Amino acid sequence: MEIEKSNNGGSNPSAGEEFKDMIKGVTKFLMMVIFLGTIMLWIMMPTLTYRTKWLPHLRIKFGTSTYFGATGTTLFMYMFPMMVVACLGCVYLHFKNRKSPHHIDRETKGGVWSKLRKPMLVKGPLGIVSVTEITFLAMFVALLLWCFITYLRNSFATITPKSAAAHDESLWQAKLESAALRLGLIGNICLAFLFLPVARGSSLLPAMGLTSESSIKYHIWLGHMVMALFTVHGLCYIIYWASMHEISQMIMWDTKGVSNLAGEIALAAGLVMWATTYPKIRRRFFEVFFYTHYLYIVFMLFFVLHVGISFSFIALPGFYIFLVDRFLRFLQSRENVRLLAARILPSDTMELTFSKNSKLVYSPTSIMFVNIPSISKLQWHPFTITSSSKLEPEKLSIVIKKEGKWSTKLHQRLSSSDQIDRLAVSVEGPYGPASADFLRHEALVMVCGGSGITPFISVIRDLIATSQKETCKIPKITLICAFKKSSEISMLDLVLPLSGLETELSSDINIKIEAFITRDNDAGDEAKAGKIKTLWFKPSLSDQSISSILGPNSWLWLGAILASSFLIFMIIIGIITRYYIYPIDHNTNKIYSLTSKTIIYILVISVSIMATCSAAMLWNKKKYGKVESKQVQNVDRPSPTSSPTSSWGYNSLREIESTPQESLVQRTNLHFGERPNLKKLLLDVEGSSVGVLVCGPKKMRQKVAEICSSGLAENLHFESISFSW
């Protein structure tokens, strides 16, 4: 009877699911309306209609208050709407995450949306870009061009030889100064979006179906635009001042208007960051790239001091959301987490297993940032989570490949003969998609190279857990993996967890693995004899299980933080302005120091964010701390020097009982000395909807994207997972 009920629920959504869909639809509609309204303001901003009709009316309505003064205009026009959108996004994601596992969102079923997500450009400076991404990029560039051309046309129309002579300028100098100003205005539009892709816990990205990792390329594009526009903006002003014999303007700090020196400091910080993003520098000297990016604090601080707080609110909403996310990550990273065990594979791969709060739920392909102070106190590195919160509710695992200096030091420490009782670790995350609707496909093909297999381990484990606990149909799984050496086959041992499975894989799981070893012609002695070393740690009682900093209802709490911190900010600023600034300045903006006013706003924003985030964290820690204390496991375990060898490469030499691992081995085909024929393997997969995921080298991702976009098979739906930034 229970099975019949579940099956009916899979095809006919319950009233509860329909209500959630309705709430999601309403919130997403409101988000879209408000966001499009903000875009409309940007479109109208350079026009004469906005300047002569809209702006005077808006200033009378919002800019004459004794509580906010002239700042109220941009505060309520740009800052307030985006905060509402972010809060609505939190509500949307809360209900989205509450859907049943067999319920498929209407927007993910396919059709036109699936075609728009197909790759359009495979090779080139932009990387692999879909039709949707190209469309939005073109629309954004069109917005920038529209604003710049309209600004110039309207400003140049007022510049005449007579007006230029009145300011002791030639015509070209007046036009150069006008163009320089407009370039800065266009840069502010790009800056408004710059920090949203790197706000890992933001509600805006997952509400649009994006993750922070997949959105890094948008941050890169926007970063290049911002720095290009601001650099030309600064150079034009330097040329203008030099031609006017006013080069001393470069060191001017006007406390009642624009501070040139502050702008130059901001630009210098931005140029240092921009220089380290050069691919060769970023890849060879990642630490330099990583550390110099902390100059964003200097960049934003002096940008606000340069233009003043009132104009900054046009570009500050994204940075405000980023600050909330950044401080929450800071609070989470202050605690050490409980590291239970480490496995070292023959392929120089390490699996770290942590204790996890059972209420922490994350989606497959999520990542987590890890810091190990004994190796480096400052470096944080992202790693893919390989475990499934459904299959292993109290454990979380990540896989680390020995490649750079940091991972090499970790491998040396874990491999040393000296016994390690404890390893202090701090984490940030997990971060990932709000949901992963793999069930919408009839078949799932995962193509990976080397350590690119790690995100797919979590996908497979999640589908296995779903097959054990739910009655929905599981897609056929094909894992195509390419390794350089036979010793790397041992990474397939990580596909299944050490515990949490039944005696055999469920018959509902139709999984096939095609493993290609490109440089070896057989398994080799190293792969046959390689031992898997396992270490068990004895964590300190002060170590915490990994948990969400805001508890199980994290999206609602994030919305509450955004709303309350912004409300507190407005209340405090309203009081300060009404009873301190207004009696001095009377809304003239000519008496009270603009620099002092800006610093007050920055301090109030910082205090509001820190206070609300800390209060929310302490509340959730107090509420769910008791649950976590009951999860403390007996960590006084032996530390064996090695465990059984890998299941691959020698299975024909031994007889073992039926286990999930052996069941997986039987479904694996090993191909030595050859590369996968991706075109044949992908086109041979049957099904009306085939999800194709790829994670690996750039050429592999491009090849798979080219096949999926070629039109040879309309049923292939491409998705790339890249961590090469």
UniProtKB/Swiss-Prot annotation:
Record-annotated Ferric oxidoreductase domain positions: 183-303
Transmembrane parts of this sequence: 29-48, 75-93, 126-149, 218-241, 292-316, 339-359, 555-577, 598-619
Localization annotation: Cell membrane
Location, primary (coarse class): membrane
Reaction(s) this enzyme catalyzes, per UniProt: 2 a Fe(II)-siderophore + NAD(+) + H(+) = 2 a Fe(III)-siderophore + NADH
Induction: Circadian-regulation. Up-regulated in roots by iron deficiency, carbon monoxide and by treatment with glycine betaine. Down-regulated by zinc, cadmium and cytokinin. Not regulated by copper.
Extracellular side: 49-74, 150-217, 317-338, 578-597
Disruption phenotype: Impaired growth on media with no added iron. No response to glycine betaine in chilling assays.
Tissue specificity statement from the Swiss-Prot or TrEMBL entry: Expressed in the epidermal cells of the roots. High expression in lateral roots and root hairs. Detected in leaves, stems, siliques and in flowers in anthers and styles.
Gene Ontology terms describing biological process: response to bacterium; siderophore-dependent iron import into cell
GO MF, one example: metal ion binding
Family annotation (InterPro entries): FAD-bd_8, FAD-bd_FR_type, Fe3_Rdtase_TM_dom, Fe_red_NAD-bd_6, FNR_nucleotide-bd, RBOH/FRE, Riboflavin_synthase-like_b-brl
Gene3D superfamilies assigned to the protein according to its UniProt record, in alphabetical order: Nucleotide-binding domain of ferredoxin-NADP reductase (FNR) module, Translation factors
Annotated positions binding NAD(+): 429-432
This protein's domain notes: The C-terminus is probably located inside the membrane.
Family: Belongs to the ferric reductase (FRE) family.
Other remarks in the entry: Post-transcriptionally regulated by iron. Coordinately regulated with the iron transport protein IRT1.
Protein name as annotated: Ferric reduction oxidase 2
Name of the gene this protein is made from: FRO2
